[in-house]
Design a protein with these regions (language model features):
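Catalytic cores of alpha/beta
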Residues: 28, 80-88
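Glycine-rich, proline-tolerant flexible connector loops at the mouths of alpha/beta enzymes
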Residues: 39-56
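Conserved, mostly hydrophobic/aromatic
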Residues: 24, 31, 42, 86
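Alpha-helix-loop-beta-strand connector modules within alpha/beta enzyme cores
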Residues: 52-72, 110-119
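A structural motif
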Residues: 33-38, 67, 91
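Hydrophobic faces of well-ordered beta-strands that scaffold small-molecule active sites
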Residues: 10-15, 39-41, 70-74, 94-96, ...
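Short, Lys/Arg-enriched N-terminal segments with co-localized hydrophobic residues
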Residues: 1-7
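Conserved anion-binding
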Residues: 20-23, 65, 81-82, 91-125
Length: 125
């Protein structure tokens, strides 16, 4: 609970995973027209999690047309392998899972070295 006189600030970042993949730009554009300024990308490799989703090429092509903040959630094994690709694709923040990175400290430091914000996802199970 917030202290009296302190306001909590929340940011909503809709995930494009729920979008129609054949119309990603149209879906993102519609969200931006509605006021969305943060967009969440769930990047899955089919190994860390069973599904496969976006990769750097899709993020890069949407970045060319969008000024929104790109929040990239890496659900992949050894995310450090993909960090430069995410930077070059236009990610503003990259969140990784502690259990997916052999050297968590190196991965988080590398995200920051590349000029992105670093996030850490914890599995509550």
């Amino acid at each position: 609970m917030a202290e009296e006189g302190v306001f909590m600030k929340y940011t909503l970042a809709p995930s494009l995973l729920a979008a129609d993949f054949s119309e990603l730009w149209e879906e993102l554009s519609k969200a931006e027209r509605a006021g969305v300024r943060f967009v969440h990308f769930d990047v899955m490799d089919g190994s860390f999690v069973p599904n496969i989703s976006f990769g750097a090429p899709i993020i890069r092509s949407l970045r060319k047309r969008s000024q929104s903040f790109f929040d990239v959630h890496m659900m992949v094994e050894e995310p450090i392998r993909y960090l430069e690709d995410m930077k070059n694709a236009g990610a503003d923040r990259v969140t990784i899972h502690s259990e997916a990175a052999r050297h968590l400290d190196r991965s988080l430091n590398r995200i920051r070295e590349l000029g992105m914000q670093a996030g850490l996802a914890l599995n509550p199970a």
